[in-house]
């Protein structure tokens, strides 16, 4: 007799879970109860769900599972940053990073194993593309991290840990890990909906950010299906340079990208788009580039996030000197462009923005790769 694959409940958003429970004759409130057990309480056993009927739990045990990806390693930085390496099979892995700050806790999650966009400055792209992640594997990163962090948390040190305030460990999620989220849209969408669902993680639309290299048609779909904070990997102020740094620009050039950003803003929870700009020595960091970037930024409501490049041997690129980054940022601010600079985090555990390569076979090259995790922490100019 052929066995039937059991349904992984981690990958079902509220509508899909209600449909499943309805097929068994269950009421919608049962689906909500089940969703809270899985995502809010972090249950991985149906026996623990004591307020559900015994026959319902038996049905769940027969037909369903609650399974995240296997964890190969966990690393902790001296600055509090934590990283998990999840096994996706065939010797490949994805990486998930938690960045604690005084006023928030941000989880950076992956949407693909590898990436097809192949941005020149990103080591993930240099690793090639393995496969899309399933919705259960995407939300499973949040599910796992929430369980681990909450189990170990000292309440007095949680973000927002004052009396009467939200004391959740993970207050923000950014889809800025491995992969291009909008090229895995059908699996990313239910994961995003779960992040926002009050019966699951209950995050604000302003606190969930999708970062895209500029997949214009899917930006339009996201604005209709699940509008939330959007970051665009810009990295160049003109098409000629962006064609070289972000090859997707050859399909969706800057004029199309900026128009899509303007359309997105009509539905977005924030009144601006974040443009990410990796600072590359002698490549995109000159005064002329700053002038071009100012003209581009004035075409859409945005803020600029300047990212120090984290070198890796295959790129052939170098990080812009700190003094050059400061001058570049000041020029933008003097022109009235809101600008932030990211601070490096987790450099001792190889947890870098644009550097998540998910290596399983060789985890010993941390010094060689010299990667750093970066997060936005300061405004350059008030």
Curated annotation (Swiss-Prot):
Q: Name one GO biological process term.
A: rRNA base methylation
Required co-factor(s) are: [4Fe-4S] cluster
Which cysteine pairs make disulfide bonds?
108-353
* Any Gene Ontology CC annotation: cytoplasm
- What reaction is this protein's catalytic activity? adenosine(2503) in 23S rRNA + 2 reduced [2Fe-2S]-[ferredoxin] + 2 S-adenosyl-L-methionine = 2-methyladenosine(2503) in 23S rRNA + 5'-deoxyadenosine + L-methionine + 2 oxidized [2Fe-2S]-[ferredoxin] + S-adenosyl-L-homocysteine; adenosine(37) in tRNA + 2 reduced [2Fe-2S]-[ferredoxin] + 2 S-adenosyl-L-methionine = 2-methyladenosine(37) in tRNA + 5'-deoxyadenosine + L-methionine + 2 oxidized [2Fe-2S]-[ferredoxin] + S-adenosyl-L-homocysteine
Location of this chain's protein in the cell: Cytoplasm
What terms describe the molecular function in GO for this protein?
A: 4 iron, 4 sulfur cluster binding; metal ion binding; rRNA (adenine(2503)-C2-)-methyltransferase activity; rRNA binding; tRNA (adenine(37)-C2)-methyltransferase activity; tRNA binding
Residue ranges constituting the Radical SAM core domain according to the UniProt record: 101-348
Co-factor remark: Binds 1 [4Fe-4S] cluster. The cluster is coordinated with 3 cysteines and an exchangeable S-adenosyl-L-methionine.
Q: Which residues bind [4Fe-4S] cluster?
A: 115, 119, 122
- Could you tell me the keywords of this UniProt record? 4Fe-4S, Cytoplasm, Disulfide bond, Iron, Iron-sulfur, Metal-binding, Methyltransferase, rRNA processing, S-adenosyl-L-methionine, Transferase, tRNA processing
Provide the primary localization.
Answer: cytoplasm
Other comment: Reaction proceeds by a ping-pong mechanism involving intermediate methylation of a conserved cysteine residue.
The function of this protein is:
Specifically methylates position 2 of adenine 2503 in 23S rRNA and position 2 of adenine 37 in tRNAs. m2A2503 modification seems to play a crucial role in the proofreading step occurring at the peptidyl transferase center and thus would serve to optimize ribosomal fidelity.
Family, according to the entry, reads as follows:
Belongs to the radical SAM superfamily. RlmN family.
What protein is this chain from? Dual-specificity RNA methyltransferase RlmN
Which species is this UniProt entry from?
Bordetella parapertussis (strain 12822 / ATCC BAA-587 / NCTC 13253)
């Amino acid at each position: 007799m052929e066995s039937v694959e059991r349904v992984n409940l981690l990958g079902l958003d509220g509508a899909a879970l209600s449909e499943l429970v309805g097929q068994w004759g269950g009421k919608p409130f049962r689906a909500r109860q089940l969703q809270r057990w899985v995502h809010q309480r972090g249950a991985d056993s149906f026996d623990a769900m004591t307020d559900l009927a015994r026959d319902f739990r038996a049905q769940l045990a027969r037909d369903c599972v609650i399974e995240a990806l296997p964890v190969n390693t966990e690393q902790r930085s001296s600055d509090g940053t934590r990283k998990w390496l999840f096994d996706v099979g065939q010797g490949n892995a994805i990486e998930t990073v938690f960045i604690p700050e005084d006023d928030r806790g941000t989880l950076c999650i992956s949407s693909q194993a590898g990436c097809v966009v192949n941005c020149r400055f990103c080591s993930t792209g240099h690793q090639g593309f393995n496969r899309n992640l399933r919705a259960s594997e995407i939300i499973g990163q949040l599910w796992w991290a929430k369980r681990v962090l909450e189990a170990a948390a000292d309440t007095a040190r949680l973000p927002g840990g004052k009396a009467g305030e939200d004391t959740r460990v993970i207050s923000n999620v950014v889809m800025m890990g491995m992969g291009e989220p909008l090229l895995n849209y059908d699996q990313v969408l239910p994961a995003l909906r779960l992040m926002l669902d009050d019966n699951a993680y209950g995050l604000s639309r302003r606190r969930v950010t999708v970062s895209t290299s500029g997949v214009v048609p899917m930006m339009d779909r996201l604005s209709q299906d699940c509008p939330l904070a959007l970051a665009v990997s810009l990295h160049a102020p003109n098409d000629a340079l962006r064609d070289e740094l972000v090859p997707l620009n050859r399909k969706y050039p800057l004029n199309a990208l900026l128009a899509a950003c303007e359309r997105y803003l009509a539905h977005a929870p924030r009144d601006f788009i974040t443009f990410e700009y990796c600072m590359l020595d002698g490549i995109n960091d000159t005064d002329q580039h700053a002038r071009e970037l100012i003209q581009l930024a004035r075409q859409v409501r945005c803020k600029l996030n300047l990212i120090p490049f984290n070198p890796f041997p295959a790129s052939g690129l170098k990080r812009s000197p700190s003094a050059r980054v400061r001058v570049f940022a000041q020029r933008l601010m003097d022109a009235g462009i809101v600008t932030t600079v990211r601070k490096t985090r987790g450099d001792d555990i190889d947890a870098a923005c644009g550097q998540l390569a998910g290596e399983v076979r060789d985890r010993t090259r941390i010094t060689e790769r010299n990667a750093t995790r970066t997060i936005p922490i300061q405004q350059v100019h008030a």
